[in-house]
Design a protein with these regions (language model features):
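Active-site hotspot residues in diverse enzymes, especially metal/ion-binding acidic/histidine motifs
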Residues: 19
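Tandem CBS (Bateman) regulatory domains
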Residues: 1-9, 23, 27, 45-86, ...
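Cytosolic beta-strand hydrophobic patch enriched in CBS
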Residues: 13-15, 32-45, 72-73, 91-105
Length: 125
């Protein structure tokens, strides 16, 4: 199975906002992360853990977001995506096209929600 079959549309922001604004958006939308995008390309990712580590600080997302984004292509297999998540200790992967334009996001939760689509061999060898 390929990433494009399970990926979702990401929630993006295109301007530098405060952590308070970020927390409000994530809370109201039930999101675990936001992607900071410029000209269609992901420039940073901020996740709930980043907010917790910086709780109460008057900062903007640009100062704490992860800028070294690990991304995948829509044609990447779910197995490869899981391996990348495990190796890098991350739960979400932005999905980009051949021009590095953001086209989706894949999370561990997306994979878990679709576990019935995989056979037992996939997870348990």
């Amino acid at each position: 199975m390929e990433v494009k079959e399970l990926m979702r549309q990401p929630y993006i922001i295109e301007k530098d906002i405060s952590l308070i604004e970020t927390a409000k958006i994530m809370s109201s939308k039930g999101l675990g992360c936001l992607l900071f995008v410029s000209n269609g390309k992901a420039k940073g990712i901020i996740c709930d853990g980043d907010l917790l580590k910086n709780f109460g600080k008057h900062k903007r997302i640009s100062s704490i977001m992860s800028k070294n984004i690990i991304s995948i292509r829509p044609e990447t297999t779910i197995e490869e995506a899981l391996k990348l998540m495990k190796e890098n200790k991350i739960k979400r992967l932005p999905v980009v096209d051949e021009n590095k334009k953001l086209v989706g996001i894949l999370s561990m939760a997306d994979i878990a929600a679709n576990i019935d689509k995989f056979d037992g061999e996939f997870f348990f060898g």
